[in-house]
Curated annotation (Swiss-Prot):
It holds the Pfam family Peptidase_C101. Changing residue 56 to A/D: Abolished interaction with RNF31. This is Ubiquitin thioesterase otulin. Its EC number is 3.4.19.12. Changing residue 272 to P: In AIPDSB and IMD107; decreased stability; impaired ability to mediate deubiquitination of linear polyubiquitin chains; loss of NF-kappa-B inhibition and increased NF-kappa-B signaling; does not affect ability to interact with RNF31. Changing residue 336 to A: Stabilizes H-339 in the active conformation, generating a more reactive enzyme.
Length: 352
């Protein structure tokens, strides 16, 4: 993939902090993904956009990131998807040593985050990064099996949807999957079963430490890890179909879903699958508007410290804008809206 200037869509007047990324994504899609930065800079510090890279990482950069994560524990041990925790400001000093405007902005952003969290865990930066960071946080914090995973209808979804929407057979199976799409119903059902089983097992553990150890182990098993991502992508598609059908019937839907289907590349769920979800893990990650869909799929509020937006209203972005009060919260750190890391160790004097 070529690497150039990361698109910086126009700001939408009146957008709330959490809605802006979805609006940005829609604006970018309408402009062919090449919209240039046009918002007026704030008088105070903002991270510069002119030298930022494409939304998704080049293959050589992904491989370099993988090698770094292997070296965290040693080449002879299992490959890590989520590195061990380290002091968040030590990590910042290691990653951002220069005195450029962007480095200064990042340091200030990390300093702000360090008021809430003392440590960070680096997440492997491939095109599953957003899914990996979100799912790892959600499962490691599990204190019970969510009602949506207990629903007996869940395992019937693959056959039900694929029989109703023939275009789902265009599904592109993820990495580490054997077999062909003729086995698609069984493959997705196996992934959903694994997600339920692993989530339930983690939720039954008595201590947070035990859950963390088990979750670390799960995310070193690539076959199981990638199967979980397939399940989550299918849940995202299911929610997209529900939202699209509601919109077509004139029902009230979350604003992000209007923007999701306003893109030239995802006018309907079929296009969303072909042009976006099928690319996740292969050639692209999740776009900003799709982070809302991810939140709805796993029914978790996703709070992100967007360090490139330091000193703006978008520094802390919440997906979705107005989440149900009973949704658990996962917190992530993003340096550039494509690579997510995990903050850990909430400061004793701080509460979210």
């Amino acid at each position: 993939m070529s690497r150039g200037t990361m698109p910086q869509p126009e700001a939408w007047p009146g957008a709330s902090c959490a809605e802006t990324p979805a609006r940005e994504a829609a604006a970018t899609a309408r402009d062919g993904g090449k919209a240039a930065a046009s918002g007026q800079p704030r008088p105070e510090m903002q991270c510069p956009a002119e030298h930022e890279e494409d939304m998704y990482r080049a293959a050589d950069e992904i491989e370099k990131e993988k090698e770094l994560l292997i070296h965290e524990r040693g080449a002879s041990e299992p490959r890590l998807s989520v590195a061990p925790e380290m002091d968040i400001m030590d990590y910042c000093k290691k990653e951002w040593r220069g005195n450029t405007q962007k480095a200064t902005c990042m340091k200030m952003g990390y300093e702000e985050v360090s008021q809430k969290f003392t440590s960070i865990r680096r997440v492997r930066g491939d095109n599953y990064c957003a899914l990996r960071a979100t799912l790892f946080q959600a499962m490691s914090q599990a204190v019970g099996l969510p009602p949506w995973l207990q629903d007996p209808e869940l395992m019937l979804l693959p056959e039900k949807l694929i029989s109703k929407y023939n275009w789902i057979k265009q599904w592109k199976l993820g990495l580490k999957f054997d077999g062909k799409n003729e086995d698609l119903v069984d493959k997705i059902k196996e992934s959903l079963t694994l997600l339920r089983k692993k989530w339930a097992g983690l939720a039954e553990m008595r201590t947070a430490e035990a859950r963390q150890i088990a979750c670390d182990e799960l995310f070193t098993n690539e076959a199981e890890e990638y199967s979980l991502y397939e399940a989550v992508k299918f849940l995202m598609l299911n929610r997209a179909i529900e939202l699209y059908n509601d919109k077509e019937k004139g029902k009230e839907v979350p604003f992000f879903s209007v923007l999701l289907f306003a893109r030239d590349t995802s006018n309907d769920p079929g296009q969303l699958l072909r042009n976006h979800l099928n690319q996740v893990g292969h050639t692209g990650g999740l776009e900003q508007v799709e982070m809302f869909l991810l939140a709805y799929a796993v029914r978790h509020t996703i709070q992100v410290y967007r360090l490139s937006k330091y000193n703006t209203e978008e520094f802390i972005t919440v997906y979705p804008t107005d989440p149900p009060k009973d949704w658990p919260v996962v917190t992530l750190i993003a340096e550039d809206d494509r690579h997510y890391n995990i903050p850990v160790r909430v400061c004793e004097e701080t509460s979210l």
